[in-house]
């Protein structure tokens, strides 16, 4: 069922790195009542993420990097273990993820498989993330990875079982990473 939405005002509060909007809108409820809402919405663009896995070695490739938002929210070191990811900018999701994989992990991926698209924080963030997986092998390692000039990324090749355990221990706390690791487990690609 489609609800009627009328935009009243869209005020840009910040357009520094991403865009923060203050949006006022009227929402017509199912019973016909019109309710006025005022919300802040953070537009950071859409993104893509990929989990690299090796079924023969039973390993996955993840990265560790500083994430300021986690630091602000109590992660003492600010370090987060996660899947390779990036913003689309003007690229198609598959093009983006191939670029990010080589930059961040050093692996030049072959065939990729798109799984799904998800909003990760739809209450206030516009970002839609495209989720991919790809099998990798040692001979696909083109460089050391580590990201571009302003990034400081550590590449982690981990046993799949250890990565799953790291979810339980709280060492992996990134939503997209947990989703992809759980997908890999339930799909039985590592059996």
UniProtKB/Swiss-Prot annotation:
Query: Under which main EC class is this enzyme filed?
Result: hydrolase
Q: Which InterPro entries match?
A: NDP_pyrophosphatase (IPR004385), NUDIX_hydrolase-like_dom_sf (IPR015797), NUDIX_hydrolase_dom (IPR000086)
Question: Which residue range or ranges hold the Nudix hydrolase domain?
Answer: 43-180
Family matches, as SUPFAM superfamilies: Nudix (SSF55811)
Annotated motif Nudix box, positions: 86-106
Q: Which GO terms describe its molecular function?
A: hydrolase activity, acting on acid anhydrides, in phosphorus-containing anhydrides; metal ion binding
For this record, an example GO cellular component is:
cytosol
Q: Name one GO biological process term.
A: nucleoside phosphate metabolic process
Q: Which residues does UniProt call coiled coil?
A: none
Q: What is its EC number?
A: 3.6.1.-
Where do the annotations place Mg(2+) 1 binding?
A: 85, 104
- The domain of life for this entry's organism is Bacteria
Q: Which reaction does it catalyse?
A: GDP-alpha-D-mannose + H2O = alpha-D-mannose 1-phosphate + GMP + 2 H(+)
UniProt: Mg(2+) 2 binding residues: 100, 104, 151
Indicate whether Hydrolase appears among the record's keywords: yes
Please provide the record's free-text comment about the domains of this protein: In the dimer, the N-terminal domains are swapped between the two monomers, such that residues of both chains contribute to the active site.
So what family is this one in?
Answer: Belongs to the Nudix hydrolase family. NudK subfamily.
Q: What is this protein called?
A: GDP-mannose pyrophosphatase
Species annotation: Escherichia coli O139:H28 (strain E24377A / ETEC)
Q: Which gene encodes it?
A: nudK
